[in-house]
């Protein structure tokens, strides 16, 4: 586990790009040495503590970001890179298999994707990485209680349902009710335009940022 000694500046993008700036890695200290298996055991214990108390744990992803993996084994930030797609698919599969108490994952057609305005390339990428990865991970446990929560962000319901029609688990939607923080406006109007597009077939989570 590393921690940088460098001072953070205010040049970081709100899109989440370039958060692993080189200067941050030039002056680091090791906080703790821990193996990957010890890390996995730690999170299994956390999930067990949550499950014992009736708390369901989900992992949400803002896509796509390859921090820590970019530049290794041919992995890049390019949506068309088959190696990157295979990497995310395999990572999703193994996460599901290694954490049996994980109840689901959430995904976003978000800031790290460079084709927001073209066809359904974002959704196709999400399906080929996370969608196929979920199916792979549930192959040996098809009756497992697991769901995918797809954020209704920079996408459309038709693109989600078309691309994820072969998903082997429950598909829910998620919408940011207030877009910004919950106290920024007393009567958020943003959901009004989304209501007609939401489907009765899919549960929709209204999320609020505090």
Per-region residue spans from a language model:
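Active-site-adjacent "subsite" loops/lids of carbohydrate-active enzymes
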Residues: 11-31, 56-93, 109
């Amino acid at each position: 586990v590393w921690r940088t000694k460098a001072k953070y500046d205010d040049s970081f993008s709100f899109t989440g790009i370039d958060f692993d700036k080189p200067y941050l890695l030039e002056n680091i200290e090791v906080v703790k040495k821990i193996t990957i298996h010890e890390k996995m055991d730690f999170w299994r214990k956390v999930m067990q503590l949550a499950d014992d108390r009736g708390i369901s744990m989900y992992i949400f992803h803002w896509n796509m970001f390859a921090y820590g993996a970019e530049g290794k084994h041919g992995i890049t930030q390019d949506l068309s890179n088959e190696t990157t797609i295979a990497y995310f698919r395999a990572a999703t599969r193994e996460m599901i298999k290694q954490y049996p108490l994980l109840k689901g994952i959430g995904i976003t057609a978000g800031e790290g994707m460079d084709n927001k305005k073209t066809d359904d390339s974002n959704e196709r990428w999400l399906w080929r990485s996370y969608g196929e990865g979920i199916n792979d991970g549930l192959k040996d446990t098809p009756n497992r209680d697991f769901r995918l929560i797809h954020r209704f962000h920079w996408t459309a319901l038709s693109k989600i349902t078309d691309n994820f029609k072969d998903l082997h688990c429950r598909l829910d939607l998620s919408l940011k009710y207030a877009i910004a923080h919950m106290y920024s406006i007393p009567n958020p109007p943003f959901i009004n335009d989304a209501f007609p597009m939401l489907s009765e077939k899919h549960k929709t989570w209204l999320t609020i940022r505090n």
